């Protein structure tokens, strides 16, 4: 009887652990108006809001993009934390048949590499973008990128209203103090 109770308890623990660690990120549909040539010509964008609160440095990032010699776009984002500044360089490869979605091979400042998939959920291809990032495991995140680090572009607010999201509940540059 003790053995049955022990095995049942162990099974429940394993199931609970599996459910906690099975959270995955699924890319949402990209913006229909996404224009790669215009979008990747945005000179500098600031992460102004982050859906997830960890890590807080998500909203202390500055994004710049250039074309590499092979024609691929390379995005560099600088993390400006209160105590540390570091850069991450990502080479973006379009996902075939999915305009506005990319697989990004990123080199961290310590030399490590990670791969994330991204989807441009909404953009005007000039002043703002709402970017979803999905790592190979875990929940991922959604970031608001804007050329103006203060305020919220009307297009961002319109998208949030359409989705039923409240931007005031998201982490912002103001609340973190970048």
From Swiss-Prot:
Disulphide bonds in the chain: 25-134, 60-178, 90-106
A GO MF label: toxin activity
GO biological process: symbiont-mediated perturbation of host defenses
InterPro entries: Calycin, Triabi/Procalin
Signal peptide per UniProt: 1-18
Major localization class: secreted
Pfam family, one: Triabin
Keyword terms: Disulfide bond, Hemostasis impairing toxin, Platelet aggregation inhibiting toxin, Secreted, Signal, Toxin
Subcellular location field: Secreted
Any one GO CC term of the record: extracellular region
Tissues showing expression: Expressed in salivary glands.
Protein family membership: Belongs to the calycin superfamily. Triabin family.
Role, per record: Inhibits platelet aggregation and vasoconstriction through binding to distinct eicosanoids involved in inflammation (acts as a scavenger), and has a role in inhibiting host innate immunity by impairing platelet-assisted formation of neutrophil extracellular traps (NETs). Inhibits platelet aggregation by collagen, and low doses of thromboxane A2 mimetic (TXA2 mimetic), and arachidonic acid (AA) without affecting aggregation induced by ADP, convulxin (GP6 agonist), and PMA. Binds to TXA2, TXB2, prostaglandine H2 mimetic (PGH2 mimetic), PGJ2, and PGF2alpha.
Name this protein carries in UniProt: Platelet inhibitor triplatin-2
Originating organism: Triatoma infestans (Assassin bug)
């Amino acid at each position: 009887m003790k053995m049955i109770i022990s095995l049942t308890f162990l099974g429940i623990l394993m199931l609970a652990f599996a459910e906690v660690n099975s959270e995955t990120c699924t890319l949402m549909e990209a913006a229909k108006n996404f224009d790669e040539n215009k979008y990747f010509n945005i000179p500098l964008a600031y992460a102004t809001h982050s859906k997830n609160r960890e890590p807080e440095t998500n909203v202390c990032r500055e994004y710049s993009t250039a074309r590499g010699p092979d024609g691929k776009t390379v995005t560099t984002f600088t993390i400006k934390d209160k105590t540390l500044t570091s850069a991450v360089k990502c080479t973006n490869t379009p996902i075939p048949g999915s305009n506005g979605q990319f697989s990004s091979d990123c080199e961290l400042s310590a030399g490590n590499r990670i791969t994330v998939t991204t989807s441009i959920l909404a953009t005007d291809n000039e002043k703002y973008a709402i970017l979803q990032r999905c790592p190979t495991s875990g929940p991922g995140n959604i970031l608001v990128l804007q050329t103006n680090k203060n305020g919220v572009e009307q297009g961002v607010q319109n998208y949030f209203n359409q989705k039923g999201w409240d931007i005031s509940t998201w982490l912002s540059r103001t609340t973190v103090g970048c």
